[in-house]
Amino acid sequence: MGRKLYYVLATLQLVAVFLFCGGFFPQKVVLKNDSKFIVNPEVQLASKPVFKKLVLVVIDALRSDFLFQKDSSDFEFLHGLLNSGEAWGYTAYSNPPTVTLPRLKGITTGSAPNFLDAILNVAEDDTSSNLKEQDSLLKQFHTHHYKMNFFGDDTWLKLFPLEFFSEYDGTNSFFVSDFEEVDFNVTRHVPYQMEHQKNWDVLILHYLGLDHIGHKGGSKSHFMPSKHREMDSVIKQIYEKIDGDTLMVVLGDHGMNDLGNHGGSSSGETSAALAFLSKRLKKYQSSDIQQSSNVPVEDAHPDYKYLKEVEQIDIVPTLSMLFNLPIPKNSMGVIIDELLQLLPSKLAAIKVQDNYLQLTKLKPGYEAQLEKKSAGTLLEEMREIQSSLAMAATNYNYTFLTYGTTLMIIGTLIVTVWNFQLSQEYIEHVGTSVLLGISMFASSFIEEEHQIWWWITISVLLLMQISNGKKLVVLSGLRLIRGWNNSGQKYIYDNVLHTLLKSHTSVLWWLNVVTFLSVGFPFLRNKDESEKMVSLLSVSFLALSSITYKICFAIVNGDKVPSGLYTFALRSCAMYLANENATESDISQCLVPIARIFFQICGVSIIILLFMKYALNKSTNMLNKLLSVIKFVLLLQTSSANIPLFLIFEILTSVTPDITPIFSLCLQNLTFFQFGGTNSIATVNLTNAYNGVSSNYNIYVVGVLMFLSNYAPSIYWALSLIPQSYKQKTLRLQHYYITGTCLMIACIALRYHLFIWSVFSPKLCYYAAWSLYNVVMDFAITLLGVL
């Protein structure tokens, strides 16, 4: 296939993918204008709210067991309130995608999440998700002249106009290495706010530290208990200062899985904690389950369902009722029935009817009937309406879906016919592509895709024309890769090499040092003396700066490192800070500068290599040297416990230097999953997305770093096939055409499937990201003239 046709087809694939995504992830259509009271508006307008003030404390990723289960919870003060009846607890079901932006939309508007919000969740400067024109709980508070103060996650300041808040101070939600300062910057406002309660009617606090700990160390991190106690002390500090006319609500926006990630639909991710706190509640009866339970609960529930379960969006009509506000127009929530006790019976009945009529307006063609229906009957009917609305919350753009799928089918036919030949290589490629394509129609196969790639990789290895000795070495390496991390979304194993090495830090870190040095070896293969000197300096600076950064990063995050490396990092920071008395607390000041120095060295090294090649015509082994620089970047963007895997990669490439395109394709996919990646948003790793990024957030820099950190092993094996012929490239392109076409057809056919947003949609996003990388990399290599 000619070069021009290849690039036309590659571009066509990218256009088709983004056309399809544009139709599959449209902005949700919402009802405009603000809501008004529907049933007996004059009675409701004349009524007084149950509470005068609201304190809303959002603890990011507060899973239900963190609040209610003995082995997982250290909220002693809150436990006392739950047992005395001054607090009522619930497990709040958080609709996927379980990331902050869509969940805050759900908590404030009561509407179903839009998957596009999960993607925009990392776009700090994005304004397309703004709720200025959409009816919400905060807009109703603002309209009814409640003074609101906000402190915490600045996602709120993206969602709502600043004029909603009398006072505000945002903290950045994505610097996940920060456990303490990000919460201190919220808590420092609490004493003043408690002493000046006349200055606000609604106080919103959003804490991020617990979520950050989860991302770094998982749900059982040793930092968790102290963070629980810290949050509990904040709750106590506030509760002891407020009076009976103030309602306090403590909740998580979502939960997390055992690895500390979230975004998917597992029980841990969707089970968030919720508690209403008020001295008044003691006079009334909490849910039957709570009355018969002693908190914290002794038994651990694998489904994380503790006390009574409600929908998280039920907070919206419930708070609207308690503060006598109209329910936001797009709310799909249903009033939590226990809290109806706080209203006079006649007013409570009116509020339930109002909720019923408001909810039925969201379901076209539904005949609302109030006559002779009790509040209990209406609540039950509303639950059924709520379920049906959640199932049909998206409006697809079928024109874009049709165009995108049609272009993919056309491209698939062209590239398949053009490549057709009866050879082992072609049959292996087509067989792999068809097998993966068929798997796109089953949610379980997508969730456990790593299993498919494992068996395909082993099969391809056995068919390779290499000696049995080499096959044995490669097979051993693959088995180590396979056992390194937990993969997939259904099962978690305790005994993996990743966990074992983290408990033997000396072995881990010396393996890391050896890996960094091994990646630099191609630099040292030179014939010219001047090249040798330049190469030696480049390797030295790249290795030293990257190793120093990873050690400092580990120390700042509370990970153990060998004493020798600890001393080395401390002295390096002391030199940078020009402070001989630098201590461990000073190391954090060096992280951003060291990372930037590393990236600058990478840039200078590449410029020198290109200059020596094209200006002096004397660069030896230039391609491998450029790849070594890129490998150093990939190492920096990889978690410390995964870095030794690159040492195995180096061994495999030395054993099979002439890697076949199909084996490279297998390793690109297999290693992505064995690094801990999945087809779920929950495993998108943000830990290394901020290397070298200061408080001046740049979405494009963070986006590139995030891509590199999540696709590092795949990029390694994709680059291992350079240089490659256009015949080899078209076989790879054919694979992504076939699997992409099947994925698009599956998404259309299963668009109303239960797991469309938690399984199929994330897979589509991963596919689009990798397709973009392949096209950009192909164009970049061509422009550089490497091939």
Curated annotation (Swiss-Prot):
Enzyme class, broadest EC rank: transferase
Domain of life: Eukaryota
GO MF entries: CP2 mannose-ethanolamine phosphotransferase activity
Topological category with respect to the lipid bilayer: Multi-pass membrane protein
Disulphide bonds in the chain: none
CDD domains listed in its UniProt record: GPI_EPT_2
TM spans (from-to): 400-420, 426-446, 455-475, 504-524, 536-556, 591-611, 629-651, 671-693, 699-719, 740-760, 767-787
GO BP: any one term: GPI anchor biosynthetic process
Enzyme Commission code: 2.-.-.-
Pathway given in the UniProt record: Glycolipid biosynthesis; glycosylphosphatidylinositol-anchor biosynthesis
Gene3D superfamilies: Alkaline Phosphatase, subunit A
A cellular component annotation (GO) from this entry: endoplasmic reticulum membrane
Coiled-coil regions, chain positions: none
Cell compartment(s), UniProt: Endoplasmic reticulum membrane
Positions annotated as glycosylated: 33, 185, 397, 485, 581, 617, 669
InterPro entries assigned: Alkaline_phosphatase_core_sf, Phosphodiest/P_Trfase, PIG-G_N, PIGG/GPI7, PIGG/GPI7_C
Pfam families named among the record's database cross-references: Phosphodiest (PF01663), PIGO_PIGG (PF19316)
Signal peptide (UniProt feature, chain positions): none
Homology family: Belongs to the PIGG/PIGN/PIGO family. PIGG subfamily.
Protein name: GPI ethanolamine phosphate transferase 2
Organism: Kluyveromyces lactis (strain ATCC 8585 / CBS 2359 / DSM 70799 / NBRC 1267 / NRRL Y-1140 / WM37)
Gene giving rise to this polypeptide: LAS21
